[in-house]
UniProtKB/Swiss-Prot annotation:
Keywords: ATP-binding, Cell membrane, Membrane, Nucleotide-binding, Phosphonate transport, Translocase, Transport
GO molecular function: ABC-type phosphonate transporter activity; ATP binding; ATP hydrolysis activity
CDD domains for the chain: ABC_PhnC_transporter
Family of this protein: Belongs to the ABC transporter superfamily. Phosphonates importer (TC 3.A.1.9.1) family.
Top-level taxonomy: Bacteria, Bacillati, Mycoplasmatota, Mollicutes, Entomoplasmatales
Membrane-protein topology: Peripheral membrane protein
Catalytic activity: phosphonate(out) + ATP + H2O = phosphonate(in) + ADP + phosphate + H(+)
Protein name per its UniProtKB record: Phosphonates import ATP-binding protein PhnC
Annotated ABC transporter domain residues: 2-246
Signal peptide positions on this chain: none
Quaternary assembly: The complex is composed of two ATP-binding proteins (PhnC), two transmembrane proteins (PhnE) and a solute-binding protein (PhnD).
Length: 249
């Protein structure tokens, strides 16, 4: 569960990018955040793992009964532990192109390895099996030993998703992951998100400009306008009037 209480974010130049954000996202939800560029979507997502600090308010994250975090008070080792549970994706694939697909997926475990094993690039049999399972989950197993730079953009983004789920996260935050893809590939990637959300019960929060994809795949849509939530609910209730409120000038 992720809960925002009266969250505000003001940049040093005085720009108010998040205004009185109050919302609760339950475990296992697939949530789309929509709105114009500059509405505060990316800033909102980046407060969840404290890439962006908030100016006021509170954010609470419950990973399980034994791991509960108040973001304002989370730092050091506690923050590192929280971030292990949060997978990050963006429109950039962030693959190492000269490495194989399997090695790219294995790289998600490096942060949890000791220094010498990480430097040597040594992965255990279990780690390799888990990485292959992540690729199989997304029907990418046949590409395991192919260099990443031989794949299409859509395939590379799906490898990035496999790498993210190999991290074994409870939450995935995706910032415009399909913006650089054509409609067919964008749908394929969204299908993958939906699959891992439903089959692995991973909470997925996605910042997306494609409203049609949000309506098609997501359980809930949050609409931001000038840093404020102006819509939060079932995609079926997102009518023309609400879209005009979110995107109108």
């Amino acid at each position: 569960m992720i809960e925002f209480k009266k969250v505000e974010k003001v940049w040093p130049n005085g720009k108010h990018v998040l205004k009185d954000i109050n919302l609760k996202i339950n475990a296992g939800e697939f949530v789309a955040v929509i709105g114009l560029s500059g509405a505060g979507k990316t800033t909102l997502l980046k407060t969840i793992n404290k890439i962006n600090n908030i100016s006021s308010g509170e954010i609470f994250i419950d990973i399980n009964e034994n791991e509960k975090y108040e973001i304002n008070k989370t730092k050091g080792k506690s923050l590192r532990n929280l971030r292990k549970h949060i997978g990050l994706m963006s429109q950039e694939y962030n693959n190492i192109e000269k490495q194989t697909v399997l090695k790219n997926v294995l790289n998600s475990r490096v942060a949890q390895m000791n220094f010498f094993r990480a430097m040597a690039g040594f992965f255990t049999k279990e780690e390799k099996q888990n990485a292959l399972a992540a690729l199989e989950k997304l029907n990418l197993l046949e590409f395991s030993y192919i260099r990443a730079d031989n794949l299409s953009g859509g395939q590379q983004q799906r490898v990035a998703l496999a790498r993210t789920i190999n991290q074994n996260p409870k939450i995935i935050i995706a910032d415009e992951p399909v913006s650089a893809l054509d409609p067919i590939l964008a749908n394929r990637v969204m299908e993958d998100f939906k699959k891992i959300n439903s089959e692995l019960n991973i909470t997925v929060i996605i910042n997306i400009h494609h409203v049609d994809l949000a309506l098609k795949y997501c359980d809930r849509i949050i609409g931001l306008k000038d840093g404020e939530i102006v819509f939060d609910g079932d995609p079926k209730k997102l009518n023309e009037s609400k879209l005009e409120e979110i995107y109108g000038k």
